[in-house]
Amino acid sequence: MMKRWMAMGMALCLTAASLAGCSGTKDAAESTQAEAETSTEEAAAEEETAKESDLDKLTFTYVTSPLNVPTIIEKNQGIFEKTFGDMGIEVDYAELTSGADQTQALASGDVQVLYAVGGTSVILSAANGADIKVLNMYSRSPKAFCMYSKDESLTTPESLRGKTIAGPTGTNLHELLVSYLATAGMTIDDVNYVNMSIPDAKAGLDGGSVDVALVAGATAYNAGQQGYHLVADGEGLIKAIIAVAVTQKFYDEHPEIIEKLEEAQTEIADFMEEKPDETMQIVADELDLDTDAVKSMYDLYDFSTEITDDDKEGFQKTADFMYESGMIDEAFDVNQLFIEK
């Protein structure tokens, strides 16, 4: 009898052990399956992130002059390329120095982001009915925009009457000239204004075909180093606003791009702040200047991207001036320039 009870006990133990083993195997299998499902979901999420935009190429304007430090740092460090490459988007650059060419490229869709466009150009384009919006600021630097001449007798607006003055149209430099002339009740029609890029204007001044060159940044610095006469700079005349612009349509249709662009700009700003010496060297190499020259000019710039009330006032001042000087046909409210979020 005792043996029988012992046999039954052994059987029960074996059964319990077997059940426990089955339960453990089942739990392990379920855990493995859950982990596999999680890995699959994560892989799918990563794939979705990479394909979250239907764009295959994104084109930015690339302008290093007058002293566009964020632009130089961005390309040198490949920040846009990495940011958007992770999304499967190719990054391309359009080297357009004329404000008119930049805004036209945005309107045609050849360029998606104007990465450093003058406030004058933005206002002129918007006033003519184009879809263009300020996403954020790029820089402010009135003292960096200058009028240089070899003729030291050119010290007043009146002394410029009939002179050949060259510089890029639709830009802060264009506004500087018109503003300077306006202080004496003159208009751009009182001078022989020639539309030229900054390098070409400086070359014209060097060669003698131009009386006054509208220059900025490194070119202005070099003109001063050559002993050329500073007729005027933008202090008290212009705000020298430069912005980052897109179309409202692009902003509405591609929020994922806008978000990544803002992150990339933060990365650029962080690099400039955390690595000032390296920043100066990179810019000096790009512009073929010594680092002391870059540091001297850098102090003239405010590269913060936030749009402030002062910036908006600056835009309005520029718009009012453009209307009064006949650059635009009707008074313009700059509040319509900013993104409708």
Language-model segments: residues:
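Secondary-structure end/capping motifs
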Residues: 253-327
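Extracytoplasmic "Venus flytrap"
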Residues: 52, 58-76, 170
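Bacterial lipoprotein signal-peptidase II cleavage site
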Residues: 19-43
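Flexible hinge/capping segments at coil-to-helix
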Residues: 149-164, 252-256
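Short loop->beta-strand "edge-of-pocket" segments that line small-molecule binding or catalytic clefts
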Residues: 58-64, 158-170, 270
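Pocket-flanking alpha-helical
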Residues: 68-74, 94-131, 143-157, 173-175, ...
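Pocket-lining segment of extracytoplasmic ligand-binding domains
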Residues: 120, 190-194, 199-283
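Ligand-binding cleft/hinge of the Venus flytrap
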Residues: 73-89, 174-193, 224-225, 281
